[in-house]
Amino acid sequence: MEDFVRQCFNPMIVELAEKAMKEYGEDLKIETNKFAAICTHLEVCFMYSDFHFINEQGESIVVELDDPNALLKHRFEIIEGRDRTMAWTVVNSICNTTGAEKPKFLPDLYDYKENRFIEIGVTRREVHIYYLEKANKIKSENTHIHIFSFTGEEMATKADYTLDEESRARIKTRLFTIRQEMANRGLWDSFVSPKEAKKQLKKNLKSQELCVGLPTKVSHRTSPALRILEPMWMDSNRTAALRASFLKCPKK
């Protein structure tokens, strides 16, 4: 699973996931499923934010990369992917600026158009079950919840899906592709089932598999959201080195 994650995701997402697991004292060599889940969640959060801006009239618009209008205000503030101290600093700043109620738990995004925090969920189970778990944990009407599944289903607070259909379709397609690539490598069952995960862990401890075949339809392009986060945690030389090593696979 670890090899798959390093092949399938942008190296900057991988490093953010590594930093998050290290912050909580988790070993990605052992908890490989959690490593994959964190990377997936990070990518969905960044895709949620990508290309969405607010114009001078306060309207939400979608702008593709390299468009001259890209200097417009970003619609979403990305909180996920930052260390806890910085994340709470961002949340406090947003609350002080907008008057929003401070959430009890760290959310993933803030929507400047709708003036609300957003909690993003990516589940391997039924979306409604995961939604209820999130809602019971957060217990706040001021945090909007949006859940995606690997099967193309989604559920959001009051059926308000925030994004346009095309933007959500991009996320669903990416999740479905990740599922298919895991299935092709015999990783999906262990990703879904804890029992299968334990079997896979024992197998991995006995023999480390060489990475095989690169995943199809994986974007080499750096997410605009990652470009925003990048200066905060990675210098340009390190970024270049990571990009140069992206998707390299050891030869047999």
From Swiss-Prot:
Disulfide-bond pairs as recorded: none
Keywords attached to this entry: Decay of host mRNAs by virus, Eukaryotic host gene expression shutoff by virus, Host cytoplasm, Host gene expression shutoff by virus, Host mRNA suppression by virus, Host nucleus, Host-virus interaction
Site (Important for efficient shutoff activity) residue list: K202, K203, K206
Protein's UniProt keywords contain Ligase: no
Active site residues according to the UniProt entry: E80, D108
Chief location: host cell
Stretch forming the signal peptide: none
Site (Important for efficient shutoff activity and nuclear localization): K195, K198, K199
Subcellular location: Host cytoplasm; Host nucleus
Entry function: Plays a major role in the shutoff of the host protein expression by cleaving mRNAs probably via an endonuclease activity. This host shutoff allows the virus to escape from the host antiviral response. Hijacks host RNA splicing machinery to selectively target host RNAs containing introns for destruction. This may explain the preferential degradation of RNAs that have undergone co- or post-transcriptional processing.
Sequence similarity: Belongs to the influenza viruses PA-X family.
Record text about domains: The probable endonuclease active site in the N-terminus and the basic amino acid cluster in the C-terminus are important for the shutoff activity. The C-terminus acts as a nuclear localization signal. The C-terminus is recruited to host protein complexes involved in nuclear Pol II RNA processing.
Complexes and interactors: Interacts with host RACK1.
Protein name, entry field: Protein PA-X
Gene name for this UniProt entry: PA
